[in-house]
């Protein structure tokens, strides 16, 4: 058991390979060839000190939704205190950091689970499980692009261990750690915009509904996606929410979708935006109904398309939040009043 977690690889090294092939496998290990890392861009990620304005350090939380929503709220209530350009720059920094952080989390998950992944049909060809990248190379690669704040780092490290039996006895599932990793930066993204104007406790309370939305949404989409592995994971007695749900998996997903929409209602009520009610709440509600009607507990592979559809929801929500910023700041009016649109 201990050999599984050794940093130094004791197995035979991969055969001869080019540097280009190694680089390709490392990028695959981080899932940079897929859409998965963009999920962290939508709702969670890391924090880092950056210099803004008059060289004041500010912590930029990787939460694009939170940053855009907080920016729209701030510019609507105190237009002289902040500019739309500043909000956009903060959002771009959040996007970049979240993307890199998620890559590190993907590597860590595969590094811990490499011996399990060898026995699961969907994951046996991943670089670490297939032996194309050694454990040492994978660990070093992860350290290269780890730049995370402490709470999220700890949660990300604990995520793969949540699949072990100790956590089962404590009724702790790995989806909880993943949900926290993506939800906590919602507060950081909020403070990246409003942290100087309001107390810390107020930032937490204002961003809490969004963080809960992201937490429950992550539980929903990860449970549906991971359900594809339920047959192999059940044989190995892997601890996970979808294994525990068993035959009641469909009802479990319905409950999670309801919790997502309930917490989203609280967030949008505070935003008081007709545009967000239409573009966010209505779109998500219709999408969830469509997803849950398509999901079939007897066909685990039906969980895969749900994950992709939620990725599309995340992209759309960035567009919706960016449009809200444009509407709140008056940028939309300026854009459409440009002479290009005049006859």
Swiss-Prot record:
Its cofactor is Mg(2+). GO terms for cellular component: plasma membrane. It holds the Pfam family UbiA. It is an enzyme of class 2 (transferase). It is found in: Membrane. GO terms for molecular function: transferase activity; transferase activity, transferring alkyl or aryl (other than methyl) groups. Keywords: Membrane, Transferase, Transmembrane, Transmembrane helix. It is a multi-pass membrane protein. One of its GO terms (biological process) is terpenoid biosynthetic process. InterPro entries: Prenyltransferase, UbiA_prenyltransferase, UbiA_prenylTrfase_CS, UbiA_sf. Pathway: Secondary metabolite biosynthesis; terpenoid biosynthesis. The chain crosses the membrane at residues 38-58, 62-82, 92-112, 138-158, 170-190, 241-261, 273-293, 311-331. It catalyses: triacetate lactone + (2E,6E,10E)-geranylgeranyl diphosphate = (2E,6E,10E)-geranylgeranyl-triacetate lactone + diphosphate. Disruption phenotype: Accumulates triacetic acid lactone (TAL). Its EC number is 2.5.1.-. Polyprenyl transferase; part of the gene cluster that mediates the biosynthesis of meroterpenoids called sartorypyrones. Within the pathway, spyF catalyzes the prenylation of triacetic acid lactone (TAL) to produce geranylgeranyl-triacetate lactone. The biosynthesis of sartorypyrones begins with the production of triacetic acid lactone (TAL) by the NR-PKS spyA using one molecule of acetyl-CoA and two molecules of malonyl-CoA. Belongs to the UbiA prenyltransferase family. This is Polyprenyl transferase spyF. It comes from Aspergillus fumigatus (strain ATCC MYA-4609 / CBS 101355 / FGSC A1100 / Af293). The lineage of its organism: Eukaryota, Fungi, Dikarya, Ascomycota, Pezizomycotina.
């Amino acid at each position: 058991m201990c050999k599984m977690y050794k940093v130094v690889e004791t197995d035979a090294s991969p055969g001869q390979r080019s540097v280009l092939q190694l680089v390709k496998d490392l990028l695959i290990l981080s899932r940079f060839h897929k859409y998965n890392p963009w999920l962290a861009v939508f709702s969670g990620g890391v924090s880092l000190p950056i210099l803004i304005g008059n060289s004041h350090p500010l912590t930029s939380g990787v939460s694009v939704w939170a940053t855009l929503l907080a920016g729209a709220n701030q510019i609507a209530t105190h237009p002289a205190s902040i500019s739309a350009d500043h909000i956009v720059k903060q959002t771009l920094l959040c996007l970049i950091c979240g993307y890199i952080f998620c890559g590190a989390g993907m590597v860590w998950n595969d590094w811990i689970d490499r011996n399990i992944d060898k026995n699961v049909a969907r994951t046996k060809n991943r670089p670490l499980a297939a032996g194309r990248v050694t454990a040492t190379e994978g660990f070093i690669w992860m350290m290269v692009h780890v730049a995370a704040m402490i709470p999220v780092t700890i949660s990300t490290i604990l995520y793969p261990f949540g699949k072990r039996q100790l956590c089962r006895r404590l009724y702790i599932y790995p989806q909880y750690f993943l949900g926290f990793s993506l939800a906590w930066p919602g507060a950081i993204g909020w403070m990246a915009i409003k942290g100087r104007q309001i107390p810390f406790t107020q930032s937490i309370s204002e961003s809490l509904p969004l963080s809960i939305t992201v937490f429950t949404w992550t539980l929903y989409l990860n449970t549906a996606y991971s359900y594809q592995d339920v047959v192999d994971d059940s044989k190995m007695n892997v601890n996970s929410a979808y294994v525990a749900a068993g035959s009641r998996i469909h009802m479990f997903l319905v409950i999670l979708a309801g919790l997502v929409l309930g917490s989203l209602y609280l967030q949008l009520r505070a935003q008081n935006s007709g545009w967000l009610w239409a573009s966010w709440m209505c779109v998500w509600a219709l999408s969830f109904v469509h997803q849950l009607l398509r999901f079939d507990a007897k066909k685990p592979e039906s969980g895969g398309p749900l994950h992709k559809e939620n990725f599309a929801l995340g992209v759309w929500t960035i567009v919706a939040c960016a449009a809200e910023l444009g509407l709140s700041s008056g940028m939309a009016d300026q854009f459409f009043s440009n002479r290009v649109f005049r006859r």
